[in-house]
Structure formats: structure tokens, C-alpha cells
Amino acid sequence: MLRKLTIEQINDWFTIGKTVTNVELLGAPPAFPAGAAREEVQRQDVAPGAGPAAQAPALAQAPARPAAAFERSLSQRSSEVEYINKYRQLEAQELDVCRSVQPTSGPGPRPSLAKLSSVTCIPGTTYKYPDLPISRYKEEVVSLIESNSVVIIHGATGSGKSTQLPQYILDHYVQRSAYCSIVVTQPRKIGASSIARWISKERAWTLGGVVGYQVGLEKIATEDTRLIYMTTGVLLQKIVSAKSLMEFTHIIIDEVHERTEEMDFLLLVVRKLLRTNSRFVKVVLMSATISCKEFADYFAVPVQNKMNPAYIFEVEGKPHSVEEYYLNDLEHIHHSKLSPHLLEEPVITKDIYEVAVSLIQMFDDLDMKESGNKAWSGAQFVLERSSVLVFLPGLGEINYMHELLTSLVHKRLQVYPLHSSVALEEQNNVFLSPVPGYRKIILSTNIAESSVTVPDVKYVIDFCLTRTLVCDEDTNYQSLRLSWASKTSCNQRKGRAGRVSRGYCYRLVHKDFWDNSIPDHVVPEMLRCPLGSTILKVKLLDMGEPRALLATALSPPGLSDIERTILLLKEVGALAVSGQREDENPHDGELTFLGRVLAQLPVNQQLGKLIVLGHVFGCLDECLIIAAALSLKNFFAMPFRQHLDGYRNKVNFSGSSKSDCIALVEAFKTWKACRQTGELRYPKDELNWGRLNYIQIKRIREVAELYEELKTRISQFNMHVDSRRPVMDQEYIYKQRFILQVVLAGAFYPNYFTFGQPDEEMAVRELAGKDPKTTVVLKHIPPYGFLYYKQLQSLFRQCGQVKSIVFDGAKAFVEFSRNPTERFKTLPAVYMAIKMSQLKVSLELSVHSAEEIEGKVQGMNVSKLRNTRVNVDFQKQTVDPMQVSFNTSDRSQTVTDLLLTIDVTEVVEVGHFWGYRIDENNSEILKKLTAEINQLTLVPLPTHPHPDLVCLAPFADFDKQRYFRAQVLYVSGNSAEVFFVDYGNKSHVDLHLLMEIPCQFLELPFQALEFKICKMRPSAKSLVCGKHWSDGASQWFASLVSGCTLLVKVFSVVHSVLHVDVYQYSGVQDAINIRDVLIQQGYAELTEESYESKQSHEVLKGLFSKSVENMTDGSVPFPMKDDEKYLIRILLESFSTNKLGTPNCKAELHGPFNPYELKCHSLTRISKFRCVWIEKESINSVIISDAPEDLHQRMLVAASLSINATGSTMLLRETSLMPHIPGLPALLSMLFAPVIELRIDQNGKYYTGVLCGLGWNPATGASILPEHDMELAFDVQFSVEDVVEVNILRAAINKLVCDGPNGCKCLGPERVAQLQDIARQKLLGLFCQSKPREKIVPKWHEKPYEWNQVDPKLVMEQADRESSRGKNTFLYQLHKLVVLGT
């Protein structure tokens, strides 16, 4: 036996490429245990060195990536093989050492079960096992497992491998009172938990006692558990942490044919540890469909100078036979009409769907035929109709098939979808028995291929397709691609039938296509998916370079894939970026503190980084919620028929943040607060709350569990959620939200996107001068479209209150009502309307043909109305030719001078207010109007008040109550909020006090004026500290304008809003410009006016240079227009009284559109010119520019990206629109990029831009990761001090995420809080400077994406003091400064 090994010898065991020296032995090598005769027949002699340890894989059979197999050059292929050969030869040398140090005996007798456990009696002998194919081999298979290190069990689906074999082993040990600890892996959670539950129920054991399970967060097991089922990932995490298998006596790995990345890495680690420190653990591999020889050779063991393959045991027999059929075998279909299958184009055509539906309808005949009773009547029809399992590739196909089947109303089918995104309650329905006389149809993805067994399935319909996760060669972004399933997978699917009776499998491909085109095996995930988490686990194992260990995998990944993953881990910060570029190792890197954290978290790398940065900046709680929510299925419900309501609800949760992630946080916190206050005490209340708020309760509970799990896991790294309650004033809340948005940008670097600018001139023309914030455009309007205005109004009712519709030829402009006391922004109703278009909601009108209308209205020349512009005003309930009503309500008509004296009555926000003119003329008009109204005998409203209704409402002034013209804003209970249209203020009024307004009082234009200070926008400080303006800015502005008489100078009139300069007179002093005061205080900054405003300004200058009288011509009605008005009235009456008959045509409208809708593009080099789509569930799936005149770049951050099969289009998920702060995209990029190179102008006097990425290779001059390089041109001026501030903030981050004696694990809570506060203040200071950065015209570098373009003499190193002392494992290196000339 071995003497005690030294620490150095143990470390050498675990490092590939090192040999163990100076090993002292006692005794001689033992004889290998004798196996059964069958074992000797199956074993093949393999010469030393010729086994799997020395053989490179056949790369042609397993291409490194599906798209790259034909592109990779021969030299690349040879280097891939070379690295695998090199490290497998090193492994073979280790085996030679292994043979020389084998101990003479086993590990000694295990302690008895009774001594180790309080479970003293496990009634294994009294249990009667079910009669399954494996039952007849019980003794033999247990004996083989005990006699061999590794056994491979191959048997048909349903033979009893997963449920019976672990029990055989358990009972074997119980009968001998010997200790055992058996773990069985399952690829899916549902499989592990359901099998454990089934066994405990069969054996009448308490779940969590002898048998238990652990899936992700949920562990139902105790110290007494002897048989535990768990997912592959859970076991892998346990083994990597322990670096040993000795926690278990038996490891049973089920479904090994599923070549996931986790599965292959688990096999690699188990194989490695079996040969080092865990040689007495028994390993069993099981599957119904695997290439046994490949696995047997992989687990070959050295015996007497030979490599002996692992033992293969065949379980013969099946529960019931399953017959296979192909399209050729189906006689009832017209084969000539079927679309041919193409290997290059995996797709389900409409005719193949129809074949599946027809098959399902034929199963009744088949059931009758099989029962031998063909004369059954409908009343005697089979009460138990066998279930059908249909395999489809994805949710879209499931939904389509679901619609086809549910339309067969009289066929008595119960259709259930089975997909990972389907609500959990619905998933459980597949296990329920159908209603008697009904047939259960399960539409499933490959989730039902293994682990999930529905026992009553008799028929399987297989489209032979799947969606596989692949990694794009160029971008490394993942995408789910439709592809043909492998024969292995299809055979696994076939095995789902025939559990309780004879089964049938229908493969919807032709037999020759199956034989010649369907691949035999699936391409292992390790060859087509990112390797990040695997490489981090390799680094934790500390067994040498990642490529050395991965070379020994069953299907080793390509060397280029390993190199790329190392670079991506350096980009995210899990591996350190070397300060000296020449020291950079492309195949390895030092694990940073962040890397160690990521390796321990059950979330992807970017979400792990989010948690760590959340800890740094004091928003850990929010980041934990986001990470938990994004790791699991989205808890926001977007029902197919109620998608718009679900979207609206999500927008409401996000507030004004425009962030999916913040919506998740707010929804989670609201749910949690409701639970804590007892509102959701009962499950029924909670479910109702979930339905009302479009939240899936089971999923949000899962998020809560993962949140708690993550909180526990990070506590070992001294990261804790701050339990102290901060001062929760409004400014703190908004600052916290901004910091969280910055943290999101840091975590999801480089998923950065900017927007193309809309053409304002074209947009104004497209909207015909309508307000883009309130209006959408429809196209393909039928002739005489104004007849259908009520239909059109009802189509948009779910979006918001329609104020007016203007019909202009084949176009219509739908304008929504805006609350006059809300800030300027694009209305939610406009977003909802554009969302309808995105969701392809059908906008269909029932119409008459133009000829029919003209034919039925005799004696009238109505044809002239075909293209007349008609305005339908719902507020005034009028339908007029456009010119008659166009200017009557336009407030610009009340402007008879560019200088006005006003009283402010209502402040909406900073720079936006209502008031009325107090000159003598206007005062007289208001006085006369008020007197006339209050002399009338007022009549109550004839109908219930509704938003937009114009009426008369009381207002108490100087203790005297009088009535004034008012508009209802909204109704709540027994009161309404009204807006006084002649003064601009608002008030709450009891409903019974509202009175009807006589028609004559609607003729005078509303006298209140709406004002907006021109050429001003919020500063960064205001945007960060408030919703749009900070509380401080709002209070300061209110103090300047309230209770004062102001002088305003009109710059322009845009959509009835006066854009003005505002002056305040104070005593005898000169006038104070209020905009200048706000800028001096740091609340505002200068900006450009919009194109429309500038146009209006020019028009006003022209008008006021002439006589004022010329301004009133537009409102004079023309006789011709009166004639058109009469014809419109006649047509409307004919339509409403049904004189035209019932409409017999349908008109499909196109739209709605808004020309200010923004399209985004990527900042990274590889994706700059790719088309970008934002997933429809995202809040930002619709983005409309509120300020098209502001040309500063705006930025969007995406939590995850994927691309389509062709690589042409990117899909963004969980997006956040960053605040519109000038220079923000450049600042965020510099702050979070691993390496930057500043661009300077030709004279070296100022910075013009920055190149961000991983830097360049000094030896070749090439970019290290060119695909993710980002070139930005600055649109504001940055100084040397700005770059220094960025470095100071990076250094502050490093202090909270570093290892070592001064690392964050050693800091006390007070010091952590102090460092967090410093980081927060530095971050806010970087973005909120007292003086805004100067605007400059962007100037692109003449050599974009080229590194090393700065004279080295101008470059100044900024090395961190601590990084120069030794090994550098900081998260962020300090950027090199470029010195500017004077």
C-alpha cells in the first residue's frame, strides 16, 4: 500500500504534465478482479499506448462547430489534433505511474449501515419488484458492478434501468448491513424528482429518508439518505468542490447519450478522479441509445500492461414492441403533394402538419381494429383512448399545432403543451388521466425524450426535428437553430411509446431520408456551445491548463474554441488581463476574485458579475433579484391573447426607467411586500394577485428561492445585503436607480447599442404636421374612410382615449388625448398602438365599396369626398372638412404679439407650465365669458362624465363659487379631476356638481396657454436625481415663477404649445432670464430646438414683420367647404341609418406607424452592420424618440443576445435604455472596457474618441479579440481629468473585489460600507459634473479599430501600486493616459 503522500505529491497527481516522484510502496500490485465469462468475450486486447489515452478523436466525425467544419483550414485542423495528441500522451504517461503505485488491497471494509445511520431497518427483502426486462438480470448486474470499476448498461427505454438498478444495489448492501451512498444523475429536474418520488411511494418510504433528491435549489434528503437522485450539474458542482468522488460509493450516470457540456465534463472529471484519488468508487453509465464501445474505450483501465475497456452489459427485451412507420408507409396521404425534405433546410411545411393531424384522427380506427370490435357505436366508444405524444422542435411549432388540433371541436381531444416555458401548472396536466372518452394529445419538445415518462402513451408522432444551441463562429453569440434530430434522439423518442401496450411510432420523413440524411448522433455540446463555466470549473480543480484537461474529454473541443473562451472570460473579468501585453497567455489566465465567485454561482458569468458589481456599488439586493430572475424562466406572463395587457403591466412596473431588469425588481419587491403585509396570506389571494398583475406565482416563488440561495452562496465571499434601511427620500431612490443602470451596463459589457437618428424633416412631412408624441399613422384607408371612424376608434380603445382622427386619402392620423398637466413625452397610447402593429394585431374594417356608396347616394356628387381631408373630433363630436375646423382650436391664433404678460396657474414640470394672458383685452374676454356662464340656469350632465368631456365645473375664488369651462381629465369614484381650459389650473370636483355646457360656449377658443421654455434640457444632475428633473430643480423653478407676473417672449408655436423665453421682473432691476438661472444652478443645460420649432420661428418672424391682421385669414370658412360639410353629413346619416345596407367588404389596414420610432445598431465591430431586433416581450421593443433634435448618442444595454440561423439578425433580450446624458455611452465604455486606447486629433490637443476591447498583441500588432472591439467618436469634450476619474473609480471597484490578505473577504462591515460609499460618490461625480461637458462634432478616427495608433512618448502608465508588487488578479487594470498638448 501507499505510504503517506506529501502535499507536493498530491498536487502533482492533479496536474496534467507532472509525474509523481519519490513514491514509496508496500507490497505488490494486486491481481485485477475476475469478471464473468461474458466479460472476457467482450474485452479486446489493446496495446499499451494505443487506447483512448493516446488516440486523437476523429475530428471529421464530430465537427468543432456546425458552420465551421468546412471553413477551418487544414493547418488549423492539424493544430487541433496536435494539441489533443500531446496532452493525451501525457495522460498515458500518468497511467504508467498509476500502475506502479497501485495499492495491494482495497479500501478496507465499510462501516455497517446501522453504525452510520439512525435508519436501522430498511425492508428491502419484503419488496416485490415489478416484472421488467432488467429484473431477470438482478443478481448478475449487481455482481458485475461490484467486480468492476466502470460498467456500461445498455437497455431499451422502459427496461427499468433508472428506477430498478439503484434499488438492487441498495438492497444488496442493506442485506449485508454494509454502508452505501448511491447517487443517480438525471439530465432534467423533473426526471430526478419524479423518479425519487416514485421509488419512495413504491417502497412506502418517506421521501428524504432512505431515498431523496436534489435539483438546483431544492434538496429533499438527510444524512440518512442512501439513494439520492440529482441533476448532472448538481453532482458536478459537488465533485469540483470536493476534488474527490469519495462522498459516494456508487455513481450512476443516466442518459449519457445526452452529450451536454455538463455531461461530458462530468464524465471527464469522474474518469480523472477514478484514476487518482477515488479508485474504489463504482461508476455505472446508462442509456437506451449510446455507442457503447466509444464509452467503454473512454473508461478503459490499465491492467497488466493492457488498456481494458469498461464492461458493457446488455439488458435484453422491451416492455412492449413499438412499430415504426415512415411517410412512405402512410397510404391515406397524397405523396405527390408533399414538400420534399432537404438536409440543408430543416423545416415543417403546412402539408406535414396536416399529415400529423390526419394521423391523430385515424387512431380511433386503429384502436377499434386492434380491439377486434369494428361494430362499436358512438355510445359504446372506447372510454380509455390511448394518449398521443407529438415531438415538435419548439414553442412556435407547438402553438401552431395546438391551434390546428383545438379547431377539431368534435374529435374529443385534450391537448397539452409540454415545454420549459409553459407554466408549471400546465406541465403537470400531462400526467393526469383524460376525461373518459377523450384522447390526450401531448405536444412536446425533447423535454419528453428522456426523464419524463407519461405511462399511457401508445402513439408517438415524430417530426424528427429539434432546436439545438449553437455558438456563432463570428460573434460567439448563442442561437437556437432548427436542425434534424439524430437517430439516437429519435430512437429515444420512439421508446416513449409501448410502456403499457404495443406502441406505434410515426416518423414524418421518408424512409430513404431517414437512412441517408438523418445523422446517427447529436454533435456534443462541448463542440458547439460556449465553454465558460466548464473552464472556470477546470481552474477551480487546479489540474493544469484548461486545454490540457479538456484534451482528455470524450469529444475534446477545438483549441480555437478554448482560446476564444479564455479571451471571453478575460473580457468579463473572471480571468485577469495582464498589465504587460507580452506576458498574455492565450490558453490560460489567473483566476480573479470575480472568477472564483462565478465558479460557485449557478448563474451565467455576466449575471455573476452583476451580483459582484452590485455589491461594490451598494445595490446588491436589486442585483440578486435580477440575477435570479434572468436565470430562470420569466415570471412576467404574456398570454397569447392578452399580450398587450401583459406588456402594459410590465411597462407600469418599470416606471420611467425603460428597463426590463428594473421592472423585474419592482414586481418582485411588490410581491414580497404584499406577502409580508399579509395581503397574500391565502394561496387563492396570491393567485388572483398574480393574474391581475400578469405574474406567474410559481415562477416568482422559484426566483425567491434562487435569490435566497444566491444570497447564502455569496456570503462566503463577505458579500451581504445591507440590512440597514437608508434614508428613502426621492432623490436617493432615483440615484439608486441610476447606479443600478450603470451596474447593468458594467455587467453586460459589451452588449451595447446606439440608435440611428430619425430624419426630422421627413418625419414632419409623414405626419402632416401632427404631434408625434400623440399621433400614429395608418395606411391603406379605404375610400370614404371617415364613414368608419367609430370602428377605427374601437380598434384603438385598448390603447387609450382617441381625441381625433384625420382622414387624408389612403392615410389616417389617429391622435390620442394628452393630459394637459402631464410632462411632455410620447404617450403610452402611442407605444401601445405601435405595439399592436409589432404583434401583427389585425386591424380590419367592415366597409362598402366606393362604387356601391356612390351608386346608392343618388343625386349627390359625393365622389368629390373620396380624397377630401376630413377631421373627426371626438371631443367636440364633429366631422368636418379639414380646413373648417383646422385652426379654430389652435392656440397659436390667440398669439397676437410675440411679447406676452402672463400669470402662471399650473406648473407641470421645470420649464413647462400653464397660464393666461393678463393684458386688458384678454381680461375683458374672460370677465365677459364668466359672467355669461354664471347668469345661466345650469343643467346637470346628461351622461356619466368621461375623460376629455368638456363641461362646466365650479371653482371657489375669493370665497365665491362660480362655474368655468373645464375638461374632465379622469374620473375616480364620486369625483373627477378637471382642467379649467381658460386658466390652465386643475381641481377635484364632485361629479354631481359638473354641469352641461351649452353649444355656444364651445365656439370661443380655450384661453389658457401652454408654455415651454425653449432651448433648455435637464442636466445630467437633474436626470440622475429625478424622474426627469430633480426635486431641487422643481422647487427652484416653482419659486421663480409661482405668484409672479412674468414676461414671455414667444420663439415658436408647436402643436399649440408656446416655446418661449421667460423673464422675471424684480423691483427696479433688469429682467432675469429664468433659463439662465436654472443653468447657473446646474439644473439645466442648453440644447437645440426641434426642426418644427425652428420652422415655426421663421414663420412667426415673417408674420410679425407684416400686419397682425393677416394672421386671422385661416379660420374663415369657404362656401366650398360648407358644401363638403353638407355631403359628409348626408353620407354619415345614410351609413348610420343603414341606407347603404350591410357592409360586405373587408379592408385590412397597415400600421400603425410613427416616423420617430428608433432602430438600434450594435457598437461592437462584428455586429455593427447586423440587423437588430428587440424581443417583443421587452419594454424597449418599441422606442420612440422624445427629443429628435438632441443628437447626442443614446445607449441601450442588453442582458443577453442571440442570432438567427443565418447570422444576419441579432435578437436582444432583457434590455435597459440608459438615461439621455451627453457622453454617457463613451463614459460607460471607458469605465468597463478591459483595455482602451484614446484617440487624439492631429495636433494632439484634445481627445476625439476611444477604442475599447482586450487590446493588441505586441508581437503581431493584431487585436486580441477584434470581434468585440468598439470604436466610439466623442460627441462631448473629455479631458485628461475625466480619464483620471475613470481610473480612480476602477481602482475603487478593485478594492472591493480582490483576493489576498487585504482582500474583501477580510474586510469588516464598516470598512465595506465605507468603500461602497466612496465608489458610489465617485460614480455619481463622474457623470454629474457641475459644468456640463462641451458639445463637439463627432470625428471618426481615420483608422477605425486599429490599435497602437498613439505615439508611445505620449502614453503614460497608470499602474496600480498593488499590481506592481506581484501577481496581478485585479478585475480592472488602470487605463494608460495619453498626454495632450497645450
From Swiss-Prot:
TM regions (residue ranges): none
GO function term, MF aspect, one: ATP binding
Pfam family, one: TUDOR
Compositionally biased residues, Low complexity: 47-62
Region (Disordered): 36-62
Biological process terms in GO annotation: cell differentiation; fertilization; male meiosis I; male meiotic nuclear division; piRNA processing; spermatogenesis; transposable element silencing by piRNA-mediated DNA methylation; transposable element silencing by piRNA-mediated heterochromatin formation
Subcellular location: Cytoplasm; Nucleus
Cellular compartments per GO CC: cytoplasm; nucleus; piP-body
Domain Helicase C-terminal: 377-544
UniProt entry keywords in alphabetical sequence: ATP-binding, Cytoplasm, Developmental protein, Differentiation, Helicase, Hydrolase, Meiosis, Nucleotide-binding, Nucleus, RNA-mediated gene silencing, Spermatogenesis
Disease per record: Spermatogenic failure 30: An autosomal recessive infertility disorder caused by spermatogenesis defects that result in non-obstructive azoospermia or cryptozoospermia.
Biological function: ATP-binding RNA helicase required during spermatogenesis. Required to repress transposable elements and prevent their mobilization, which is essential for the germline integrity. Acts via the piRNA metabolic process, which mediates the repression of transposable elements during meiosis by forming complexes composed of piRNAs and Piwi proteins and governs the methylation and subsequent repression of transposons. Acts downstream of piRNA biogenesis: exclusively required for transposon silencing in the nucleus, suggesting that it acts as a nuclear effector in the nucleus together with PIWIL4.
Name this protein carries in UniProt: ATP-dependent RNA helicase TDRD9
Organism the protein comes from: Homo sapiens
Native organism taxonomy: Eukaryota, Metazoa, Chordata, Craniata, Vertebrata
Gene expressing this chain: TDRD9
